[in-house]
Each structure stands twice: as C-alpha cells, then as structure tokens.
C-alpha cells in the first residue's frame, strides 16, 4: 500500500523526504500523462504502469498490504505474499530501487502539469 511504498522509498533514499517523490515530473503522484521529464519521472511512469497491470489481476495496489524487509538499504519482498501482495510489493520495490539510482532535479518538483505534461 502507499504507506509501505513510502517506507520502501525511505529505505533506498533515506537522504530525501518521501513527499519529494509525490509531486515530481509528470508521473510521480496521482495519475500521469505526457512524456516523462527525466529518469526519475520514468521510474514513476513504470510504477504507474505496474500498478495498472496489478489492477488487471483484480488487485487494489493502493490498498494492498504486503510483507517485505529493508536491510541496509536493500529491499526484499517476502515469499509468503499472495498473488496481489507479491505483484504490488514488486512494483514498489522496483520503483524504490529506481529512485535510488536516478538523479533528483529540484526544477522538476511541483511543475506545471498543463504546460509540461501534454
């Protein structure tokens, strides 16, 4: 669920508050359209698509609870997760790891979506 995703982000990117990823580019935050503005925004675009695939399985990605571990900045999804929990955990894990490897550009935070995300 979103609370667990926030904690995953904190695991892989402890130096930056999670909310910096909630309103970034065209895809980080609710919804998303247009062309991703950079690599970090592409992480969110992939995450959005992953949630879309989970929904096709009949899952509720924003609400699904899953089991995972964070150890020294490394995430693992637990093997005991059911189909939906495993799918959503994997979406969040991939995104959190992607965030850790992408450059954060302050100018892409809280952008004008109407102008830049056509």
Swiss-Prot record:
Q: What class of enzyme is it?
A: hydrolase
Disulfide bridge positions per record: 11-70, 26-117, 28-44, 43-98, 50-91, 59-84, 77-89
Q: How is the cofactor bound?
A: Binds 1 Ca(2+) ion.
What Enzyme Commission number(s) does the record list for this chain? Answer: 3.1.1.4
Database matches in PROSITE patterns: PA2_ASP (PS00119), PA2_HIS (PS00118)
Q: Which Pfam families match?
A: Phospholip_A2_1
Official protein name in the record: Basic phospholipase A2 CM-II
Q: Which organism is it from?
A: Naja mossambica (Mozambique spitting cobra)
